C-alpha cells in the first residue's frame, strides 16, 4: 500500500541510515532528541511482572505478539487516534456516534426553522370546531426572516465542515481498525471490554514503532497523547491564567466553560505548536519572549473580537439545543436538572498529569455518590419544612385530579378549570411536587460529613490544607459547592459564557500572556524518543518541581516552576498505580515514599504494641463523639491515612509520639493512599491483597 493510500500518516520502513536520518530531520515528532531526562524501559513477558498479572488465563491476548509496521512520521497523531479508537469502543461505535451527532445537530436547526417559519400558530391554537387539519396550519411558502437566514448560512458552513471531517475520520478509523486487528491482534469484540493497560502493553512490543527509541513505555505514550494537555494542567495548577470577567461586580468570578476552553486551546495550540504538535523552538529562546508575549496578546484580542460577531448565533444555537435536549428529561425527571456534577474548573483542578481522559472520568464517576452524600450531610431544615408543606398541598390536589381522571376520561380531557383542562394542571403540579420532594431531608440520614469527604477524596485526590479537620463546617461545604454544582447552573453558565468569553479574551487573558510564554519556556524539556514536552510530565525532576509540603524534596526558589497541592507527586503515584509495569527504579519520590512507608509501618507496629489507646491501627482521635467512633468502625473501607488527613489528626498523632519520623513529607501518606485506592475499582483489584502501605513497599 502506497504512502498516498495510507492517508499520509505512514512512511515505509527504511533500514538505510541515510533514509533514517532523513526521517529524523523532517519529522522531529517521531524522533525526539536525546537528553538526560527519561530513559528506555525494555519490556518483555519474562521480566515484567506487571504484564504477567494481566494474564487472566493462558489464552490472554498478550500471548499473540504484535507484528512490525511501517515507520510513522507523526507518532503523536497516530497514538492519539489509537487511543480515541479505544475510547470510542471500535469502528462501528465511533461511526454511528459521529453520524448521529451530525444528524442530531441538523435536525435541531431544521426543526426549529420549521417551528418558527412555517407553522401558523393562529390556526393551530384556534378554538374552531372541528380543529383545522395539519396541512391548514403549515405554510411552507412563508418567508424566512433575514436574521434566521444569516444563522442558517453560518450553520450550513459549520455543518459542512463537520461532514467533511466525518468522511475523513472514516478512513483514519478504518486504518486504526486494521492496526488493532492485524498488528495488535485485538478484534472489534474485544475492544469493547479490553483495558487500556493491555493495549499499551501490546503497543510497546510493536517492533520499530518509534524509529529512535528501541522500546517505548507507558509514560512515553501518555506524554505523546497528552503533550498539549499537560501544559494546560500546569497553567491551571499554578494559577497563571487570568479568567476573571472584566465587568464591575463580576471580577471575582472565575470560571471555565466549554466555550472558553475551546477558545483558549485554539488560541494557544495553533500559536505555540507546529503542525506536528511540537512546541516551536522560538518559544524556548528567552530573547524572544517579549515579542511572543505581544503576539499572544494580539491573538487573544483578535479571537475575542471575532467571537463578538458570532456570539448571537452561538448563543441562539445553544439555547434551542438545550430546549430539545432537556425538554423530555425535564418532563419525566424534573429533579434531574437539580442534580449535581463537577464544574469544568473542578475537573481541571482534579486532572492529573499524564492522566488519560477515560481514567480521569472513572475517578469522577466513582466520586459522585460520595460527593452527593457529603452535600446531603448539611441539610437545611427550614427549606425542608417549606418544601414538605408545598409538596403536601400540591400533592393532595394532584392526587385528586389523578383519581378523578381514572374514574372519568371526559373529566381529565374536557373539564375546564380557569380555561385549562385538568391534564394541564397535572403536568404543572407533578413538576412542582417532584422538585419540592427532592428538597425534603431524609429522616433516616446520619450526619457524617467527614466520612463522606474522605471517600470523595479517595477518588478526586483533592484536599486543600484549609479543609483539613474542618470538613464539618459550612465554610468548607460552601467552598466544596463551588466545585460541585447543580447541572442547571453549569448549563446557564455555558450559555452566558458565550457572551462573556469574548471579553475575557480581549481584556483578561492578555494580562497573562507574559506569564504563559514564560511557563512554556521554563517548563519545556526534551525527553528521549518523545521530543519536547512539559517537564511536569517527565516525572523525573521532583526536587525542582514538587510541593515540599507533600514530601517532594523540593528546595527550589523558582516559583513559576513549582506545583501546588502536590500535583506532581499525586500524578506520579497515580500513574504508577495505573501502569504497574512502568519502571520507577530511579524515581526519587517513590524511593522516598518507600522508605517513609517502611519506617511508618515499623512505628505503627511499635505504637500498637506499647499503647492501649488504639482501635485497630488508628490512633485515638482528639475527640470522642459517637460520630468519630462510628467513623473508625466504618474505616475499613478507607485507609487510615485518609481519615487522618480529613479529620486533621495526622499532626496530633505525631505530637503524641516523639519518636515519630520527622520527614519533610507532610501528609505524603494521604497522597499515597489516595492513588492506591484507585486500585479498589480497577482491573488489578483481585491481584493486590495489600492495598495500602504494602503496595508502596512493592513499588
Swiss-Prot record:
Glycans are attached at residue 139. InterPro entries: Autophagy-rel_prot_9. Induction: Expression is up-regulated during development and Legionella infection. The keyword Transport applies. It is a multi-pass membrane protein. Forms a homotrimer with a solvated central pore, which is connected laterally to the cytosol through the cavity within each protomer. Acts as a lipid scramblase that uses its central pore to function: the central pore opens laterally to accommodate lipid headgroups, thereby enabling lipid flipping and redistribution of lipids added to the outer leaflet of ATG9-containing vesicles, thereby enabling growth into autophagosomes. This is Autophagy-related protein 9. It comes from Dictyostelium discoideum.
